[in-house]
Amino acid sequence: MTQAAEHITVLLHEAVEGLAIKPDGIYVDGTFGRGGHSRLILQHLGPNGRLIAIDRDPQAIAEAAKIQDPRFEIVHGPFSGIVSYLDERGLLGKVDGFLLDLGVSSPQLDDAERGFSFMKDGPLDMRMDPTSGQSAAQWLARADVDDIAWVLKTFGEERFAKKIARAIVHDRVTEPYVRTRQLAEMIARVNPSKEKGKHAATRSFQAIRIYINSELDEIETALNGALQALAPEGRLSVISFHSLEDRLVKHFIRKHEKGPEVPRGIPLTEAQLAGGRKLKSVGKALKPSEHEVTENSRSRSSVLRVAQRLAE
C-alpha cells in the first residue's frame, strides 16, 4: 500500500453541531472513514451515550478498531444497510442523529493502489470495498459503448462520453485498460474540453467510481432508511461533494418537508396535511469557510444539509 496523506475531515464541527447531540443519545456515523466525525461525537456524548459507526472500506474498519470505548461500535458494510443494522440491535426509531459524509476520502484518493485517482498510477480498481464486487478494470473490459457512454454522461455529466467510450472499446481489443494513468492519458487525448482547474479525466473517473460502487442508489437507500431509524426530533446531517449527491439530498429533504401529493378537491385539515410531513430543514445549506478551503482544497465543493425528523 502506498502512503496516504492524513485525512482532514470536511465541515467537521458544523456537521456534528447539526446533530444537536444529547449526552445520553444514540447516534450513527454512516461513513466512519478515518474517524474524524466519530471521535468528535464521542467527545460530546456522556457515559450513557452510544455511537454506531458504519463503513465498507476494510482500511476504515482497521482504523475504527483503534477506538477502545464501550460507547462505540463499528459495523463493516455499506451505509445503505442502516435499517437492518439497527433492527438487529433493537434501535429502529430510536436514533437521535445520523451523519453521512459522502464521496471518496483523502486516504482512498491518495493511495494509488485503490485506483481512485487519475493523478497517481495504480490498478484501475475504484471499489470502496476491494473484497466485494467488480473492479473498474473488469467492468471496462466487458461493457459495450452505449453502457460506458451512459455511465459517463449520467454520473459524470461528461459531454464527450460517447467519444471516450468508443476509444475504450476500440483500444481494449489489443490493450485492456487496467491502470489509472493509462485511462487518464487516453481521456486527456480524446477529450477536447478544457475546463479551468479541472483535469480532462475528472468527470469520467467520478462517473466510473459512482457506478462501480452504486453510490447514488446507496445514498437514496440510506436516506430512506434514516426515516425509519430516527426518533422524533432526531437529526440527519449530510455532507455531499458534487452536484449529483447534493441534488439527491436536497430533493429528498424537500419531498419529505412537503409531504405526499394530495389531489385537488380532497378535503383535508391543516393537521392532516402536516401529518404526512416527515422532515423539516434546519438552517440553510452550509459551504466551507474560506479558511477551510485554503487549508483543504478538497473541501471546496462540499455542502452540508441538516434536517430534523418530525413525529408522525
From Swiss-Prot:
The UniProt function text for this chain reads: Specifically methylates the N4 position of cytidine in position 1402 (C1402) of 16S rRNA.
Q: Does the keyword Signal apply?
A: no
Q: Quote the biased-composition stretches of kind Basic and acidic residues, using this chain's numbering.
A: 287-298
Q: What is this protein called?
A: Ribosomal RNA small subunit methyltransferase H
Checking NCBIfam families in the record gives: 16S rRNA (cytosine(1402)-N(4))-methyltransferase RsmH
Q: Which InterPro entries match?
A: RsmH, SAM-dep_MeTrfase_MraW_recog, SAM-dependent_MTases_sf
Compartments (UniProt record): Cytoplasm
Enzyme Commission code(s) on record: 2.1.1.199
Q: Cross-referenced Pfam families, in alphabetical order? A: Methyltransf_5
